[in-house]
UniProtKB/Swiss-Prot annotation:
Taxonomic source organism: Pelodictyon phaeoclathratiforme (strain DSM 5477 / BU-1)
Comment field on protein domains: Consists of two distinct domains, a catalytic core and a N-terminal extension that is involved in tRNA binding.
Protein name (database record): Serine--tRNA ligase
Subunit structure: Homodimer. The tRNA molecule binds across the dimer.
GO cellular component: cytoplasm
Length: 431
């Protein structure tokens, strides 16, 4: 959530940001917000004046009663009327506060100066040129769907029978390979990169979604259990960030770095017309997430660290990839700056997003009220929050299967995963 003081002082900058994000239609909300804010200020001032008058007259009434000289009846009637007026103002003030908060919750984050201005994904900049590794794929390639079916390690049809399209089933050595990926990534982040592992809940309340910015703007993308009023998490970012919701963090503990595995659930509303085959777009997938809480002056250095940590996984797996710096028209509403890491699919002949690494500055912390004090007597400040996929396994699995396939139709397991799988190859004989 944006700081309303920033909007008051620099409304033109916020309007420019909306235009750069291709959200010019949201511009009237800024004027509406400022009008409501002025109305609120006037109401607060009037209410405070009346409360001061009530306090003053209440003392006069007490003096009259104490002295026994004169009558306080008329003053009491006047103050009853004043109290009723104050109560009405407080009710109106509550409604105004709700309107203001609704607008603030719907506004996107500001943008970092380094974010390129652009209209769509076509305007994203290549931050790191494609990183390649030597593969000898000089034979007719199978895509991940064909490999999964022929080796009996993936079953999308039975997943659809159980739950509907978009819910894959991993079988036998496919399940072992998926588990190996998750364990390898967690071990890298905790043992090499210094993150603390967390195993979070897979369901959260609405306040948690609100804290990280998925609610109310992206309410149509999350699965809701109506009876218990809980939501399936779209990413571990939600429960992990909200671990510290409403807390005052000790500056000595910053930065805080967490790594977490979770299943992720997304309705993918509006995906009609997009490529939804196999792992390309699913409703349930596995992901290892990195989340950081930092001091404001350290957050952009932390963003580069998160990106490098995600890249380290792909380098170890020898998966070809590239890094994009997202433009203003493609970056998520919550982020001030974001890198996308894309893996190469040799069968599809295109790049697939496998990780997003974002800095939210104080946008989430303000919504979730996560603060710290730089010194014991200092004014509390909001922390900066960051997150990055480290990584999502679904599209990573696409690239892995397709790059590590052989002419005979088997899959060689990447060397760094063999310690976890306890096998080197997946062949037609897989169970």
């Amino acid at each position: 959530m944006l700081d309303i003081n920033t909007i008051r002082q620099h409304p033109e900058e916020i309007i420019s940001m909306l235009h750069n994000r291709q959200l010019a239609s949201e511009e009237p909300k800024i004027e509406q917000l400022l009008n409501l804010d002025r109305e609120r200020k006037g109401l607060v001032q009037r209410s405070d004046d009346l409360k001061a008058l009530r306090n003053k007259v209440s003392k006069e009434i007490a003096e009259i009663k104490k002295s026994g000289i004169g009558s306080s009846g008329e003053l009491i009637l006047q103050m009853k009327s004043v109290s009723e007026e104050i109560a009405g103002m407080d009710t109106s003030l509550g409604h105004l506060e709700e309107e203001i908060e609704t607008i603030l919750l719907g506004l996107p984050n500001k943008l970092h100066p380094s974010v390129p201005v652009g209209r769509s994904a076509d305007d994203n900049q290549i931050f790191k040129e494609p990183i390649s590794f030597p593969y000898h794929l000089d034979f007719p390639l199978k895509n991940h769907l064909e490999l999964g079916k022929s080796l009996r390690i993936l079953d999308f049809e039975r997943g659809a029978k159980v739950c509907g399209a978009g819910f894959p089933v991993y079988i036998g050595k496919g399940a072992r390979l998926e588990r190996a990926l998750i364990n390898f990534m967690l071990d890298c982040h905790t043992e090499r990169h210094g993150y603390t592992e967390v195993f979070p809940p897979f369901f959260v309340n609405q306040e948690s979604l609100r804290g990280t910015g998925q609610w109310p703007k992206f309410a149509d993308q999350v699965y809701h259990m109506e009876e218990d009023d809980l939501y399936a998490i779209p990413t571990a970012e939600v429960p992990i960030t909200n671990l510290h919701r409403g807390e005052m963090l000790d500056t000595k503990t910053l930065p805080i770095s967490y790594a977490a595995y979770s299943a992720c659930f997304r309705r993918e509303a509006g995906s009609y017309g997009k490529d939804t085959r196999g792992f390309l777009r699913v409703h349930q997938f596995n992901k290892v997430e990195m989340v950081k809480f930092t001091r404001p002056e350290e957050s952009y250095e932390a963003l580069e660290t998160i990106r490098e940590n995600a890249e380290a996984i792909l380098t170890a797996l020898k998966i070809p990839y590239r890094v994009l710096l997202l433009c203003s028209g493609d970056i998520s509403a919550n982020a001030t700056k974001c890198y996308d890491i894309e893996v190469w699919s040799p069968a599809e002949q295109k790049y697939l997003e496998a990780s997003s690494c974002s800095n939210f500055e104080d946008y989430q912390a303000r919504r979730a009220n996560i603060r710290f004090k730089s010194e014991s007597n200092a004014k509390p400040e909001f922390v900066h929050t960051l997150n990055g996929s480290g990584l999502a396994t679904s599209r990573l699995m696409v690239s892995l299967l397709e790059h590590y396939q052989t002419a005979e139709g088997s899959i060689m397991v990447p060397e760094v995963l063999r310690h976890y799988t306890r096998f080197d190859e997946i062949t037609q004989a897989a169970e």
